[in-house]
Amino acid sequence: MELRFDLHIHSEQSFDGCMSLSEIVRLARERGLNGVAICDHDRVLESVPEYDDFLVIPATEISTERGHLLGLFVREPIETRQFSEAVTAIHAQGGLAVIAHPFEHSKDEHRLDDVMSRLDGVEIWNSRADRKNKNANAMARELARKWEMPVTAGSDAHVPEEVGGGVT
């Protein structure tokens, strides 16, 4: 059985999102997904709905000095903006630390070498990343391959049309 998840979506709780959680779930179901991760900027869902046939993963997207970091399966906000501290805080909650769109704003393929061993995965497909760097997703795939890291994909949806644009 194949499961399809969009592991990077923003709700209206993000400063730049506009969709309610119920709208995200409805759209994701219509598009054949089995679940989503709600990765609002620097915050987490106050309550996580449970469905028999659909999974909502509590998550967050943290802005750090090294770029954006997804904390999957976290239920408490991560207050720090320091990359290493944020990874530690995610792990303390039993979450997974995934580097999000690592080359959207930078083409330096070695900029994360010193922290890769602490991460749980690399977002290798982000449907918005190639807008700023046309090679961003290809570079992320190469980073994951080089470090033999698990991978994720997400739409980074901020508007309804984008939901399901990246699927793991």
Residue spans for each PLM region:
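Short, charged N-terminal beta->alpha structural module
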Residues: 83-91
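Divalent metal-dependent hydrolysis catalytic cores, especially in the metallo-beta-lactamase
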Residues: 6, 10, 24-42, 96-98
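Ordered, amphipathic secondary-structure segments that act as subunit-interaction surfaces
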Residues: 80-83, 100-101
